[in-house]
Regions:
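Extracytoplasmic/secreted envelope proteins and their assembly/folding machinery
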Residues: 80, 124-128, 160-164, 236, ...
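Short beta-strands and strand-coil junctions in structured, solvent-facing domains, enriched
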Residues: 50-53, 72-73, 89, 107, ...
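Short beta-strand-centered interaction patches in the first periplasmic/extracellular domains
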Residues: 94-106, 133, 137-213
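Surface-exposed cap/loop segments at beta↔alpha junctions
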Residues: 48-134
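Solvent-exposed, acidic/flexible segments
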Residues: 56-58, 76, 116-124, 152-163, ...
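Single conserved hydrophobic/aromatic residue that forms the stacking wall/gate
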Residues: 1-11
Length: 293
């Protein structure tokens, strides 16, 4: 059984200096999804060293949080993000530092791209170039397909808006996961079969069926092709398990419970952890994989 927890925080500033903090009491709440907004992390650290606390006050500071189990695969990256808010206060005899982190924050907020291509250029080429300009590594699901710009393509503006435009024309969707640009099919998945969850491997309690009506986006008529209404037809479930840092939205997870059994797509997740406390859980919103009609 995986009972011995591990944690580590790494601070990296704009000049690539690094400071690692281990052995501290930490608490975190992480929310990740396939939305184009940044994933977020609320992090609380007790008795952080002054040197590391000073680094957190610098512009463009990146915080990397790793957690895991010493009797399993050890430390795994659970979140990487830019510090947008940070403050410290005394609570009894403890100095508490609270911060808010956002994944891909600088890339989404600041990146301006200028691209121009001749006719018949692949949309993959455009995505690769946008990712490079945004300072992001890009990963593609292995079933992604790319059309071309028959009449060429040019764009000047925010990188995120360029990604919207390029992906919309080839039935793809993008998100940023751990500072990596993730590209999958609209309504698809990464095809990464992450883990298998059973009561013996960390599944907790009963899975809960999700009852959702059509989203507002599904009701609106747009000129762009969208598969969002189809996604609403799939059966969804809320699943709780022991903390699983390797899981990301878009991945596949195998669930073996009394209620459901099979592979499901992770649409969103929340990690909640307290190193010395009771919380050390992951909550998943998953959907069954339905063949295309």
């Amino acid at each position: 059984p995986r009972v011995r927890r591990q944690r580590q925080m790494c601070i990296r500033d704009s000049i690539e200096a690094k400071a690692k903090e281990q052995g501290l009491e930490i608490e975190f709440d992480i929310a990740k999804s396939l939305a184009k907004q940044s994933n977020s992390c609320s992090l609380k650290i007790y008795n952080l060293s002054k040197a590391t606390a000073d680094k957190l006050e610098r512009a463009d500071t990146i915080c990397i949080l790793e957690v895991g189990y010493s009797q399993d695969a050890g430390l795994k990256r659970i979140f990487i993000g830019w510090v947008t808010d940070c403050y410290s206060y005394m609570s009894g005899s403890d100095k508490v530092t609270e911060m808010k982190l956002y994944d891909g924050h600088v890339a989404i907020r600041d990146s301006i791209v200028s691209l121009s291509y001749a006719k018949d250029v692949s949309r993959k080429k455009a995505i690769d170039d946008v990712a490079a300009d945004m300072g992001l590594v890009v990963t593609y699901a292995d079933d992604c397909e790319f059309t071309t710009f028959a009449n060429g393509f040019s764009f000047v503006g925010a990188g995120r808006e360029c990604l919207d435009k390029v992906c919309a024309g080839t039935d793809l969707e993008w998100s940023i996961q751990n500072n990596t640009l993730q590209i999958i099919k609209q309504g698809g998945n990464t095809n990464v079969q992450a883990i298998k969850l059973t009561p013996e491997s960390g599944l907790i309690g009963f899975v809960e069926k999700l009852l959702k009506g059509p989203t507002k986006a599904a009701k609106q008529k747009t000129s762009k092709k969208t598969t969002q209404p189809k996604r609403d037809k799939k059966a969804g479930w809320n699943v709780k398990c022991l903390l699983q840092p390797v899981l990301n939205p878009g991945d596949l997870v195998y669930i073996d419970s009394q209620e459901i059994k099979g592979w499901f797509k992770i649409e969103s997740l929340k990690h909640n952890g307290s190193y010395s406390g009771q919380n050390w859980y992951t909550e998943l919103e998953v959907y069954e994989i339905v063949p295309k009609e």
